[in-house]
């Protein structure tokens, strides 16, 4: 898993008024929890987290909070403003070598599906899968081979197995499918 360096400053004031003042200065209130004791409240700049948030990749965040120390964490939750889509709060989860974490990992389809060769269209239904594992065992992406996928067939979460990972999505959830295109459907009707 790739690492991302992030530095924050401790947060002194709390509440709605203080949070609004922080956001006016292009800063984002954040919290780190999951370690021993209470959570660490801090502030990060909007520019510092842009590459972390707006990326399809997953990162292990090496977080340094001035006066509190350094932590290894993952991005747990991001809250966006419902109208402006600005980031209003970020939650980080501290990770350790012995405690498993749950996070979403991007799905990458490999191979050329048989159904696509027959005129179908490959459709990725789930871009990310929720997995549970030690953070050191979580891969950057989940590769799924679709070479044997026929026209009209799907790959469901229950059919997938990755060593050291537990998939948390519903077993019958469709990850990808080869669907019949309108052109192929029209050609089939004309033959009849």
Swiss-Prot record:
- Name the domain of life this protein comes from: Bacteria
- List the GO terms this entry assigns under cellular component, sorted alphabetically: cytosolic large ribosomal subunit
Keywords per UniProt: Ribonucleoprotein, Ribosomal protein, RNA-binding, rRNA-binding
Q: Does the keyword Methyltransferase apply?
A: no
Which Gene Ontology molecular function entries are recorded, alphabetically?
A: 5S rRNA binding; structural constituent of ribosome
**Matching InterPro entries:** Rbsml_bL25/Gln-tRNA_synth_N, Ribosomal_bL25/Gln-tRNA_synth, Ribosomal_bL25_b-dom, Ribosomal_bL25_C, Ribosomal_bL25_long, Ribosomal_L25_dom, Ribosomal_uL5_bac-type
Q: Which GO terms describe its biological process?
A: translation
Give the matching Pfam families.
Answer: Ribosomal_L25p, Ribosomal_TL5_C
Q: Does the keyword RNA-binding apply?
A: yes
Q: What does this protein do?
A: This is one of the proteins that binds to the 5S RNA in the ribosome where it forms part of the central protuberance.
Describe its partners and assembly state: Part of the 50S ribosomal subunit; part of the 5S rRNA/L5/L18/L25 subcomplex. Contacts the 5S rRNA. Binds to the 5S rRNA independently of L5 and L18.
The record's comment on protein family reads:
Belongs to the bacterial ribosomal protein bL25 family. CTC subfamily.
UniProt cross-references to HAMAP family, sorted A to Z: Ribosomal_bL25_CTC
Q: Which PANTHER family match?
A: RIBOSOMAL PROTEIN L25/GLN-TRNA SYNTHETASE, ANTI-CODON-BINDING DOMAIN-CONTAINING PROTEIN, RIBOSOMAL PROTEIN L25_GLN-TRNA SYNTHETASE, ANTI-CODON-BINDING DOMAIN-CONTAINING PROTEIN
Q: Under what name is this protein listed?
A: Large ribosomal subunit protein bL25
Q: Which organism is it from?
A: Porphyromonas gingivalis (strain ATCC BAA-308 / W83)
């Amino acid at each position: 898993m790739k690492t991302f360096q992030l530095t924050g400053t401790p947060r002194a004031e709390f509440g709605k008024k203080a949070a609004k003042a922080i956001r006016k200065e292009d800063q984002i209130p954040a919290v780190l929890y999951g370690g021993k004791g209470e959570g660490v409240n801090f502030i990060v700049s909007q520019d510092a987290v842009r590459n972390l948030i707006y990326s399809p990749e997953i990162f292990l965040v090496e977080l340094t909070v001035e006066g509190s120390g350094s932590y290894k964490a993952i991005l747990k939750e991001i809250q966006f403003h419902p109208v402006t889509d600005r980031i209003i709060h970020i939650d980080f989860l501290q990770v350790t070598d012995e405690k498993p974490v749950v996070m979403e990992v991007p799905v990458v389809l490999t191979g050329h599906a048989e159904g696509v060769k027959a005129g179908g269209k490959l459709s990725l239904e789930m871009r990310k899968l929720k997995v549970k594992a030690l953070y050191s065992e979580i891969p950057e992406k989940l590769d799924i081979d679709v070479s044997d996928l026929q026209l009209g067939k799907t790959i469901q979460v229950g059919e997938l197995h990755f060593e050291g990972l537990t998939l948390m999505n519903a077993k019958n959830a469709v990850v990808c499918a080869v669907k019949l295109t309108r052109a192929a459907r029209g050609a089939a009707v004309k033959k009849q």
